[in-house]
Amino acid sequence: MSETATWQPSASIPNLLKRAAIMAEIRRFFADRGVLEVETPCMSQATVTDIHLFPFETRFVGPGHSQGMNLYLMTSPEYHMKRLLAAGCGPVFQLCRSFRNEEMGRHHNPEFTMLEWYRPHYDMYRLMNEVDDLLQQVLDCQPAESLSYQQAFQRHLEIDPLSADKTQLREAAAKLDLSNIADTEEDRDTLLQLLFTMGVEPHIGKEKPTFIYHFPASQASLAQISTEDHRVAERFEVYYKGIELANGFHELTDAREQQQRFEQDNRKRAARGLPQQPIDQNLLDALAAGLPDCSGVALGVDRLVMLALGAESLADVIAFTVDRA
């Protein structure tokens, strides 16, 4: 029998034991801080509208639903957790499976483990500090450094991402030999994301985790726009050793503005020939009922474990990656 028979786990048993210890450590971290662990559905009748996320879709055909009901596997537990927050649950965290019909490789698996938590009455900076505490505890790393999105572009690409026009962004892309992609791209945010991925990410978080905060307002997603600078959103990401670990927001609480953003996403999807997605009315109703002022973050657990173990690939820390599922 082949030594690489696909019935065998992707990860070694010693690595899976270490993974279990890290999961227990994460739970202790939140238990010590009085944060409630919750569970929410893996499937929903609505899904994300973000043009860069691709959910799995299935169909329920049980009794009473002879015509079938479209369901989507959750790309993150965010919407359901916000409904719990609006219902008065207080600070919460969740370790759960999430699903994205996208990449597969060293740092990606279509099914993955997400750690997501929400802190009422925390601003973005206070939550960044808590993320830093968790990373130091699990990874035994140095305290993180922080750069604004604008500072990161100015340092590594010598361009201001908040004021540069598309011509200037394409010129910056040309210096990275990316003209073949950039010259035909008309969406400014896609150009910015290309430059960030190829021109900024390789240079940050090498020795210690790096927070990038205050993303452009056009990339706010579900984050508030900064009251100090309306060009930027109260959003942050965390990078370490070439890997994006987490994405956090000072959460938007305005139901009307959130609906407008969802609708704008769907217009962008239509313009790109992508299917428009059903908007989560339950989330909008929860925001209208009163989501407390809060900040939240989603962190990729498989990537965290990979870094903690010094592994080369997610396959080294996941029992069965999709090619063995």
UniProtKB/Swiss-Prot annotation:
Species of origin reads: Salmonella paratyphi B (strain ATCC BAA-1250 / SPB7)
ATP-binding keyword on record = yes
Role of this protein: With EpmB is involved in the beta-lysylation step of the post-translational modification of translation elongation factor P (EF-P) on 'Lys-34'. Catalyzes the ATP-dependent activation of (R)-beta-lysine produced by EpmB, forming a lysyl-adenylate, from which the beta-lysyl moiety is then transferred to the epsilon-amino group of EF-P 'Lys-34'.
Q: Which residues form the signal peptide?
A: none
What keywords are annotated for this sequence in UniProt?
ATP-binding, Ligase, Nucleotide-binding
Gene Ontology terms, MF aspect: acid-ammonia (or amide) ligase activity; ATP binding; lysine-tRNA ligase activity; tRNA binding
Q: Its catalytic activity?
A: D-beta-lysine + L-lysyl-[protein] + ATP = N(6)-((3R)-3,6-diaminohexanoyl)-L-lysyl-[protein] + AMP + diphosphate + H(+)
Instruction: Note the SS bond partners.
Output: none
The processes (GO biological process) annotated in the record are: lysyl-tRNA aminoacylation
- Gene that codes for this? epmA
- UniProt keyword Ligase present: yes
Q: Where does substrate bind?
A: S76, P77, E78, Y118, E251
Indicate what this protein is called per its UniProt record. Answer: Elongation factor P--(R)-beta-lysine ligase
Specify the domain of life of the species encoding this protein: Bacteria
Q: Which GO terms describe its cellular component?
A: cytosol
As recorded in UniProt, its EC number(s) are: 6.3.2.-
Membership in a protein family: Belongs to the class-II aminoacyl-tRNA synthetase family. EpmA subfamily.
What lineage does UniProt assign to this protein's organism? Answer: Bacteria, Pseudomonadati, Pseudomonadota, Gammaproteobacteria, Enterobacterales
